[in-house]
């Protein structure tokens, strides 16, 4: 019978078609699900019942775990069932960031044409086509397409910051559901889920912890705190959990478990987490327009205004003189189109692109072209402390032994490079027992490991291992066998281990302890002094307390160390001072920047003592400086903060929201703000600042994507080079504007005067086209690659409100234009004495204007320095461009086929020498003006040095 049973079952199913079997199985599955629903009455009906709320981390930290579980209707041990999870997900959504679909790429491309200068050029191109000036139309269109495409590519590349946030969410996690531990996707989590954490895990959502064993979480990417936070499960009083760093019973999404294990209940997912707050701020924040973009917009509007003004004036005068109105309109529009510098956008783009290439050589990646120039008018740098001004590598710098010896420790980071120096002598191994006992205790009572200069474990423990490596004692960790361990907790604030030496296992066990001085000293009854063990007196306790206070006031994190046979009978060994040290070269860069008129402010999540100590070491903080906390910022309105923010050097306990508020206040005061940072907590501020600067090595992906510039080797000094580059680029753009506008105005005036005064036209159409090519061609373009003046870093940042067309620049443009017009008209009048226009007349006039152009370009290479001071051949591209233009002009004059096209004839050597002498006047006058200006500056310098400028923020 048993043998027949399987066959009979198979025979039973054989009677029915396959679709009937499927229907039967589906019915059983539905019945099972209905039973589950009946069993779990907590499942709310989507239409009739209230959905599970989302708790804020602040509220959840104040409540007992049982109350949190009750509010979230969760079972801490068994977790949620799958039906409940599905229903909650339908309401709360996936545990991910919803990056909304942006407008199509073609719309983004079209939006680039909204620039006033681009719109003006478009109008010029259309008019050129209507007037059959196809050469102009093609050149203008090509210029527009190049500029618009470059701007589009830069903008597209910069819009990745929101997508990068999702990378900090772990793809998978361990979650308890229906009483079973599951390996599930982090995006599947919902409020009320139970999550298990262990070493190396990245927290998948905001969790209210209900179990924690020696749990330590690295929150530096979110809060800026260097030291991993020890976590507990007890409720937190409302008065003590104001900032994220103080919520010790919450594990935040995106942070990293450094030590221990824990369980927590999900209180916030996706955008409802603290990480989500950063995401929403980034989504709402728009990158501000750069000063150069504002200047270009203003210049475009000014040129539009002047162009329409010219059209109106010429038409009015022509009408008053009785000329044909349509003919006058045609002439005036042609002149206005010719006067518009279509080469300006290309020169700006090329100049910025070359600046970006030079910055790459200096180990800085600039993601947005205009940002290079913006650095030139930056007058405030807000810098994150951790990882930017400091290395984010905890390092022991001071040792104080129980018998009063003080040792200094050199070297930085988790490596053996450095020395321990006592009274000028280098200490190594067991040469100094007082020091070596401290190092031994710190090395043995330690769970950290350093491999290939990379730390695995807590930063403070890594600092102690690095200290042992410097003394050649790091092998002590393997010399002892650990028998018992008393893990660190935030309540007891110490860690201890009970060990025996591998070679002396028959001897009594020895305890090693490290931790907060106030706690360790309670377990000590004796202290070491010059090889002897003496009873610990109150006088000695006071001495150690005083030394600990001094180290703390210097911004050091102080650890006490002890050893002995039992926890209650320990011998006090001494103190070590640990700090996250400043980066090499930062102090020098800070000094140079401050001297050049740039104010630097430190913004950090660290404590006031640590922040002020580091700022003092870097020269950012003095006795007269102020420091403000994040809580104080919250208590101020925008007006109050705007008044106080220029006077503050250090902002401590600052969250991403505080950083945003600080930057907005500075910008409201008219400052151009650069923000440096490396963590997720910096991303929003980096995007809001005029210039966001991220660290390349230590920076998170989110931070790098939100930034405008990335320092490849994390060198703060590179910012100084970038500012120098920015100032130089702006000078080059001004040089180009001066040259092109002076030449354009001269050509415009020359033809306008001839038209309005019924003179014969001094230049024919082909000659005007050739001049237009030179105006926008190689000589003009080469001004954009003029080497950066090394003196520029000493100049104060320019006011971003200033137009490119300053009064001084307009004066120089007009002077050059007047000289060119007068000189060219003089030649034309001189050749026209016979009252008959011949090819020689136009050739002399044409060549005169071209030579004026070359000398005008030469004088435009610098607004302040003499041509001989900067070097005639320092800009090789300029030399080649001018030489090429002159060769082209000579071909036009002497090459027969071109003579027919341009209606020219050969000139004598004396003619050329006469023209060279006359046209050099524009350069000579410009050099005289520079000399007068420099002399005036020297006289005014003592007066101006005593007055404050707009830069002092």
Swiss-Prot record:
Report the subcellular localization. Golgi apparatus, trans-Golgi network membrane; Golgi apparatus, Golgi stack membrane
Reaction catalysed? Ca(2+)(in) + ATP + H2O = Ca(2+)(out) + ADP + phosphate + H(+); Mn(2+)(in) + ATP + H2O = Mn(2+)(out) + ADP + phosphate + H(+)
SUPFAM superfamilies documented for this protein: Calcium ATPase, transduction domain A, Calcium ATPase, transmembrane domain M, HAD-like
Q: Gene3D superfamilies, alphabetically?
A: Calcium-transporting ATPase, cytoplasmic domain N, Calcium-transporting ATPase, cytoplasmic transduction domain A, Calcium-transporting ATPase, transmembrane domain, HAD superfamily/HAD-like
Instruction: Determine if Nucleotide-binding is one of this entry's keywords.
Output: yes
Q: How does it sit in the membrane?
A: Multi-pass membrane protein
Residues reported to bind Mg(2+):
678, 682
The active site consists of 384
List GO molecular-function terms, semicolon-separated: ATP binding; ATP hydrolysis activity; calcium ion binding; manganese ion binding; P-type calcium transporter activity; P-type manganese transporter activity
> What EC identifiers does the entry list?
7.2.2.10
Sequence positions that bind Ca(2+): 337-338, 340, 342, 772, 776
Residues passing through the membrane, by range: 105-125, 139-157, 297-316, 329-346, 734-753, 764-784, 805-824, 843-862, 876-894, 910-930
Q: Which PROSITE patterns match?
A: ATPASE_E1_E2 (PS00154)
**Per the UniProt entry, what are the Gene Ontology biological process annotations, in alphabetical order?**
actin cytoskeleton organization; calcium ion transmembrane transport; calcium ion transport; calcium-dependent cell-cell adhesion via plasma membrane cell adhesion molecules; epidermis development; Golgi calcium ion homeostasis; Golgi calcium ion transport; intracellular calcium ion homeostasis
Keyword Transit peptide in record: no
Positions in the Lumenal compartment: 126-138, 317-328, 754-763, 825-842, 895-909
Q: Which UniProt keywords apply?
A: ATP-binding, Calcium, Calcium transport, Golgi apparatus, Ion transport, Magnesium, Membrane, Metal-binding, Nucleotide-binding, Translocase, Transmembrane, Transmembrane helix, Transport
Cytoplasmic compartment: which residues?
1-104, 158-296, 347-733, 785-804, 863-875, 931-953
One cellular component term from this protein's GO annotations in UniProt? trans-Golgi network
This chain's function reads:
ATP-driven pump that supplies the Golgi apparatus with Ca(2+) and Mn(2+) ions, both essential cofactors for processing and trafficking of newly synthesized proteins in the secretory pathway. Within a catalytic cycle, acquires Ca(2+) or Mn(2+) ions on the cytoplasmic side of the membrane and delivers them to the lumenal side. The transfer of ions across the membrane is coupled to ATP hydrolysis and is associated with a transient phosphorylation that shifts the pump conformation from inward-facing to outward-facing state.
Give the family from UniProt: Belongs to the cation transport ATPase (P-type) (TC 3.A.3) family. Type IIA subfamily.
Question: Subunit arrangement?
Answer: Monomer. Homodimer.
Q: What is this protein called?
A: Calcium-transporting ATPase type 2C member 1
């Amino acid at each position: 019978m048993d043998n027949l049973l399987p066959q009979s079952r198979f025979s039973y199913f054989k009677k029915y078609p396959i679709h009937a079997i499927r229907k039967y199985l589906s019915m059983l599955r539905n019945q099972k699900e209905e039973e589950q629903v009946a069993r779990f009455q907590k499942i709310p009906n989507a239409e009739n019942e209230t959905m599970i709320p989302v708790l804020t981390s602040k509220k959840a930290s104040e409540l007992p775990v049982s109350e949190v579980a009750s509010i979230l209707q969760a079972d801490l041990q068994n977790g949620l069932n799958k039906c409940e999870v599905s229903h909650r997900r339908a309401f709360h959504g996936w545990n991910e960031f919803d990056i909304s679909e942006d407008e199509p790429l073609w719309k983004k491309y079209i939006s680039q044409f909204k620039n006033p200068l681009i719109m003006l050029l478009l109008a010029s191109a259309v008019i050129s086509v209507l007037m059959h000036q196809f050469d102009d139309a093609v050149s203008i269109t090509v210029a527009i397409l190049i500029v618009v495409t470059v701007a589009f590519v830069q903008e597209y590349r910069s819009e990745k910051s929101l997508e990068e946030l999702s990378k900090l969410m772990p793809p998978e996690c361990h979650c308890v559901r229906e009483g079973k531990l599951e390996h599930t996707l982090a995006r599947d989590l919902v409020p009320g889920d139970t999550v298990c954490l262990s070493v190396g895990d990245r927290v998948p959502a905001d969790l209210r912890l209900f179990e924690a064993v020696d749990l330590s979480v690295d929150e530096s990417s979110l809060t800026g705190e260097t030291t991993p936070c020890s976590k507990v499960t007890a409720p937190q009083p409302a008065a003590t959990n104001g900032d994220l760093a103080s919520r010790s019973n919450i594990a935040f999404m995106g942070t990293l478990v450094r030590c221990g294990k824990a369980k927590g209940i999900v209180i916030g997912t996706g955008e409802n987490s603290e990480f989500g707050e950063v995401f929403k701020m980034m989504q709402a924040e728009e990158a501000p327009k750069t000063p150069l973009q504002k200047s270009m917009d203003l210049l475009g509007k000014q040129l539009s205004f002047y162009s329409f003004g010219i059209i109106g004036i010429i038409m009015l005068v022509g009408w008053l003189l009785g000329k044909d109105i349509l003919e006058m309109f045609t002439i005036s529009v042609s002149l206005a189109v010719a006067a518009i510098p279509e080469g300006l956008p290309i020169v700006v783009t090329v100049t910025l692109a070359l600046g970006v290439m030079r910055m790459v050589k200096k180990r800085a990646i600039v993601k947005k072209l205009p940002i290079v120039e913006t650095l030139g008018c930056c007058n405030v740098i807000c810098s994150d402390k951790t990882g930017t001004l400091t290395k984010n590598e905890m390092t022991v710098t001071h040792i104080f032994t129980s018998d009063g010896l003080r040792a200094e420790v050199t070297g930085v980071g988790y490596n053996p490079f450095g020395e321990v120096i006592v009274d000028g002598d280098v200490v190594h191994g067991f040469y100094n027992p007082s020091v070596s006992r401290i190092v031994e205790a710190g090395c043995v009572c330690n769970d950290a490991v350093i491999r290939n200069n990379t730390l695995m474990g807590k930063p403070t423990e890594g600092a102690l291992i690095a200290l042992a490596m410097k003394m050649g004692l790091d092998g002590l960790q393997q010399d002892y066998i650990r028998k018992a361990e008393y893990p660190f907790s935030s309540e007891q604030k110490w860690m201890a281990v009970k060990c025996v030496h591998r070679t002396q296992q028959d001897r009594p066990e020895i305890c090693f302890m490290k931790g907060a001085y106030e706690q360790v000293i309670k377990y000590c009854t004796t202290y070491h002094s010059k090889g002897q063990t003496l009873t610990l007196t109150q006088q000695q306790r006071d001495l150690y307390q005083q030394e600990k206070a001094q180290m703390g006031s210097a911004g050091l994190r102080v650890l006490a160390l002890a050893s002995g046979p039992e926890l209650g009978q320990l011998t006090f060994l001494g103190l070590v001072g640990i700090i996250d040290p400043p980066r090499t070269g930062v102090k020098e860069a800070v000094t140079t920047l401050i001297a050049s008129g740039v104010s630097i402010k430190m913004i950090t999540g660290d404590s006031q003592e640590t922040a002020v100590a580091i700022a003092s070491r870097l020269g950012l903080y003095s006795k007269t400086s102020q420091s403000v906390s994040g809580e104080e910022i919250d208590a101020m309105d925008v007006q109050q903060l705007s008044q106080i923010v220029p006077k503050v050097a250090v902002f401590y306990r600052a969250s991403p929201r505080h950083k945003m508020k600080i930057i907005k206040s500075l910008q409201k005061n008219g400052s151009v703000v650069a923000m440096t940072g490396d963590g997720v907590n910096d991303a929003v501020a980096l995007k809001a600042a005029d210039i966001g600067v991220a660290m390349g090595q230590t920076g998170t992906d989110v931070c790098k994507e939100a930034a405008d510039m990335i320092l490849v080797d994390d060198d703060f000094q590179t910012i100084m080079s970038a500012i120098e580059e920015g100032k130089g680029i702006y000078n080059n753009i001004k040089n180009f504007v001066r040259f092109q506008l002076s030449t354009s105005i001269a050509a415009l005036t020359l033809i306008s005067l001839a038209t309005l005064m019924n003179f014969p036209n001094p230049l024919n159409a082909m000659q005007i086209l050739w001049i237009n090519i030179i105006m926008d061609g190689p000589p003009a373009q080469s001004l954009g690659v003029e080497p950066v003046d090394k003196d520029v870093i000493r100049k104060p940042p320019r006011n971003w409100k200033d137009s490119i067309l300053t009064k001084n620049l307009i004066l120089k443009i007009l002077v050059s234009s007047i000289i060119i017009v007068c000189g060219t008209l003089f030649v034309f009048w001189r050749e026209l004495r016979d009252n008959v226009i011949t090819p020689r007349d136009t050739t002399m006039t044409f060549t005169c204007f071209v030579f004026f152009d070359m000398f005008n370009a030469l004088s435009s290479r610098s607004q302040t320095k003499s041509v001989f001071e900067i070097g005639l051949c320092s800009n090789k591209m300029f030399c080649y461009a001018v030489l090429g233009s002159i060769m082209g002009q000579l071909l036009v004059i002497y090459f027969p086929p071109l003579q027919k096209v341009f209606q020219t004839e050969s000139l004598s050597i004396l003619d050329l020498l006469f023209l060279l002498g006359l046209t050099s006047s524009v350069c000579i006058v410009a050099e005289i003006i520079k000399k007068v200006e420099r002399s005036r500056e020297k006289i005014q310098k003592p007066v101006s040095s005593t007055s404050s400028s707009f830069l002092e923020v």
